[in-house]
Curated annotation (Swiss-Prot):
Comment field on protein domains: The N-terminal domain is essential for RNAP assembly and basal transcription, whereas the C-terminal domain is involved in interaction with transcriptional regulators and with upstream promoter elements.
Gene Ontology MF terms: DNA binding; DNA-directed RNA polymerase activity; protein dimerization activity
Gene name in the database record: rpoA
Nucleotidyltransferase as UniProt keyword: yes
Cellular localisation: Plastid, Chloroplast
Keyword terms, alphabetized: Chloroplast, DNA-directed RNA polymerase, Nucleotidyltransferase, Plastid, Transcription, Transferase
Biological process (GO), any one: DNA-templated transcription
Catalysed reaction, written as an equation: RNA(n) + a ribonucleoside 5'-triphosphate = RNA(n+1) + diphosphate
SMART domains: RPOLD
Protein name: DNA-directed RNA polymerase subunit alpha
Family recorded in the similarity comment: Belongs to the RNA polymerase alpha chain family.
Function: DNA-dependent RNA polymerase catalyzes the transcription of DNA into RNA using the four ribonucleoside triphosphates as substrates.
Organism expressing this protein natively: Solanum tuberosum (Potato)
Subunit structure: In plastids the minimal PEP RNA polymerase catalytic core is composed of four subunits: alpha, beta, beta', and beta''. When a (nuclear-encoded) sigma factor is associated with the core the holoenzyme is formed, which can initiate transcription.
EC number: 2.7.7.6
Amino acid sequence: MVREKVTVSTRTLQWKCVESRTDSKRLYYGRFILSPLMKGQADTIGIAMRRALLGEIEGTCITRVKSEKVPHEYSTITGIQESVHEILMNLKEIVLRSNLYGTSDASICVKGPGYVTAQDIILPPYVEIVDNTQHIASLTEPIDFCIGLQIERNRGYLIKTPHNFQDGSYPIDAVFMPVRNANHSIHSYGNGNEKQEILFIEIWTNGSLTPKEALHDASRNLIDLFIPFLHMEEDNLYLQDNQHTVPLSPFTFHDKLAKLIKNKKKIALKSIFIDQSELSSRIYNCLKMSNIYTLLDLLNNSQEDLMKIEHFRSEDIKQILGILEKYFVIDLAKNKF
């Protein structure tokens, strides 16, 4: 078991593994921290991460058994101690690790008497067994135990249904989730407005992934879920005069506005807020003190009006004119009409 002392950074956001242990071949544990976070952020991240850990990570399972000698799932076979149902349940518990895409075939062919374990499964090269000692069946007589297996990589659950039963082929309820459990907790520190949070995440896996690998996969899946919001179609950004105005996000301001102007699309200027532009914080604060919040507010003032604002300089005017020209191909009047 590995433990590390928890230290809190007061500067950049960082994560760290503070505890890691292997309880068995099929049970790994890891504890991680992420800090420093502002109040409320830890719970937001913790809830999303737990759901991604339990529901979004793919795993590999045996999903079907093929044998022409088996009349039905609840039958028994001479020379085998376990019933067919018990063998199916043992196969369900086999933990596999793979980079498989879709489904693949495997098999078992053993001559009794003796024990059949996970190490007797003949697998494709890109699939491996986590625990070779897992028990499958006990052969009490010199019989041939030969079955075919279907292996699948997926996420969540796969529940067998009546139409999945085929002659000599038996589906297995599969639990693809490599994360057995995940919890998060929050520690707050600091006083008043300086209060910050540390997020603790605990992860238990079945051995097919380490907790660190599971955390990485869950994070990647969350990122992939949010990426479409960064590539919204331009049609979603057009606003009519009678529509409710909404602020455009920073990436919209920089990446989309130039294209909209070229396409001669009308934008509701009152929906574009000046804090989303490239203006310096000092210029923004000066404009805000003069009740200038949107691009429409700005265009209702001349250069002469802006120069009357306290602490406003000619260099500030130049910066504003540059942004208006770059993104909107419009100018700001020098004097009030």
